[in-house]
Amino acid sequence: ACIELPGITVIAGLNGTGKSTIAKSVFAAVNARKNMAGKIRKDQRQSIENELEEWLEQNNDFDDIMLFFEAHEELAQHILEAYESEKWEKGDIYGKTENIIEEYCANNNLDNSDIEAPVKEIVSILNRNLDEYVQFFVEQYYQNVFKNQINPIGTGRTAFVDYKKVDAEREIASSVSIQKNRLSIIGKILTLQQENAIYIETHSVLDFCQDLGRRSNRAGRMTLPTRELLSNLMTERELTFTQQQEQERNQKIVHDIAENITHGHLQKNKNGTIEFWDEGVNGKIEFSNMSAGLKIFTVLQQLIGNYSLKRGDVLIVDEPEVNLHPTWQIALAEILVRIYKELGIYVLANSHSPYFIRAIEVKMAEYECALQGRYYFMKQDENAYISTDVTENTNEIYDALYQPLNLL
């Protein structure tokens, strides 16, 4: 597949033609390098703590229970803070690490026998190549998105995911290859990334909120996109002045969704999870009692309202027409068009509903952004389906999707 996202892109096709696979690939390509510095720091800290914990337990009988719990964490903190603030040279890491450990052990009456073993491991951790970390975390992200089934089942072909972002100032490109579900980064390693992708799958994330409150096992079976989506719904962000101004401009859409469709909003309850507050009845409505069609509007309202979706991000919606009457399909299409037109958020939508696809096409024309629309249809080619650009002839989509009605 070769997909362009200049504004709103629709991928149409029958069930089982690979639409969701493309959506997952876009999601992984955009997000795999997100917060790379934070991931590396967390991994370094955890690895150093593990080494220190094992070494300290082997050499010491702790009388102080709090010291037993905290010693390895405090030591790791001291080492990493000094490493970053003093900008240690590679040749200095061993000696400085050894000094910190010896001083800590002396101050806390701890045995520092065989100190060479943990120091060598810590030096190895801090000297690890950046490219190794990026390779590990990018592959891990793809594996989690695809549940360890990245390559098509039953084929030995190598898969490629190429991601390119072009704007007025620069061009960013990254590529990965996947062979036997193992990933390799092609070309230059990229670590900086500002945009974010949010993926709304066909099931409703709100149904998992009640499971979290009840400690249900079902909550542990969430996909990675849904886990990230739930986190975005529940987050409370500290915004900069510029971000605050942008968020305030976004409130027009939030207000319109609440006023015309949801008549309520999500809010945190005393347990720290979220609930839906219905303005009409002035009370809480259980998610299991909400209209299924109402949930996607509620999710979009929250994502825009709490600044989880911001200018330049990518919103991916998988078959959003599920549980929606054609009237609400049109309403959703208009909201998605406004999200792009007014907020500058790119939208990728998979669909097999001719109503929804036509509504996107019409609303983009109404909002004078039709040129930023792309339409693809999944066509069978030998043993696979390929995406075909039908932007100039969307009737191909409608002819195929209306065909079952013609058979009646």
Which positions does each model-derived feature cover?
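Switch/communication elements of ASCE P-loop NTPase nucleotide-binding domains
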Residues: A1-K39, E275-N406
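Phosphate-coordinating catalytic segments in nucleotide- and nucleic-acid-processing enzymes
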Residues: A32-G305, K310-G312, Y385-L408
